[in-house]
Design a protein with these regions (language model features):
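Alpha/beta-hydrolase-fold enzymes
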Residues: 3-5, 137, 141-245
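Short beta-strand element of the alpha/beta-hydrolase
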Residues: 69-77
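Short substrate-entry loop that stabilizes the transition state in hydrolases
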Residues: 78-85, 95, 110-113
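C-terminal subdomain of alpha/beta-hydrolase-fold enzymes, centered on the catalytic histidine
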Residues: 252
Length: 252
């Protein structure tokens, strides 16, 4: 896929003077930024059965788009959902541009725990593949555009890399936003100082309870006491994410 230059490519982003640094630019929009300029998005939820007989939930924005208008599919970030501020902002953008818009939730992120003894991870390109193929086959008249935020961008780019030129048969374009392409460096950074106290704590407060509910679903799946004691994402991934998805450890 050859990227096509757009006006946006030629415009350099400049943060407001009163919003310096990455932390301020991350936290302020999440808590206080205006999420949409038009009406708040209305979602229609679909439940899709996965190839391994589990399920994911897909939220489609109810928009008045042309039947042949492109479909913009957003893959959310770690512990994100269609309620995330960026998903709402993208839905607002799609409405303004006349696009169709959908947010497929990674497993366990739609508000209901999935059934299978697995969750999701940043290299889950097989999951991306069947989701995109289903969108493409369900709406063959619509060009398909995919964007991934953070972890979702990692998984989407992994899929694009695995597919190579054959990705053209499924999507018109892909984009990743704020994705930690160097996972080792990103993991090290989020486990230190301010990042550890704010972001790591926020993620673990969401991920640990879901993991323990998964353990209740599947007794013996992992060491629950060790997971309760995990203090950073590296330890959590070693105990939960890596073994559940066939990896030796976080480094693998």
């Amino acid at each position: 896929m050859k990227p096509e230059p757009t006006t946006a490519d030629l415009q350099a982003y400049r943060a407001p003077w009163w919003l310096p640094g990455g932390n301020a630019q991350t936290i302020w929009p999440a808590l206080w930024a205006r999420r949409h300029f038009g009406p708040a998005p209305v979602w229609r939820r679909e439940r899709w059965t996965t190839p391994d007989d589990d399920f994911i939930d897909v939220d489609r924005a109810v928009l008045d788009s042309h039947p042949q208008a492109p479909l913009l599919v957003l893959f959310h970030g770690l512990e994100g959902s269609s309620s995330s501020q960026y998903a709402v902002a993208f839905a607002d953008f799609a409405a303004a541009q006349g696009l169709a818009f959908a947010v497929p939730h990674f497993r366990g992120c739609s508000g209901e725990l999935n059934r299978a003894p697995r969750a999701y991870h940043s290299g889950d390109f097989e999951e991306i593949h069947w989701i995109l193929r289903r969108f493409a086959e369900a709406d063959p008249q619509r060009p398909l555009i995919a964007v991934g935020i953070s972890l979702g961008g990692n998984a989407l780019l992994r899929w694009a890399g695995e597919m190579g030129q054959s990705a053209d048969a499924t999507v018109r374009a892909v984009a990743a936003v704020c994705s930690p392409l160097d996972l080792a460096a990103g993991g090290h950074a989020i486990g230190r100082g301010f990042n550890r106290q704010v972001y790591t704590r926020m993620f673990l407060n969401s991920m640990k309870p879901k993991a323990l509910r998964k353990l209740a679903q599947h007794p013996g799946l992992f060491d629950g006491e060790a997971l309760r004691a995990a203090r950073d994402l590296y330890q959590f991934d070693n105990l939960f994410t890596a073994p559940l998805h066939g990896f030796r450890d976080t480094q693998d």
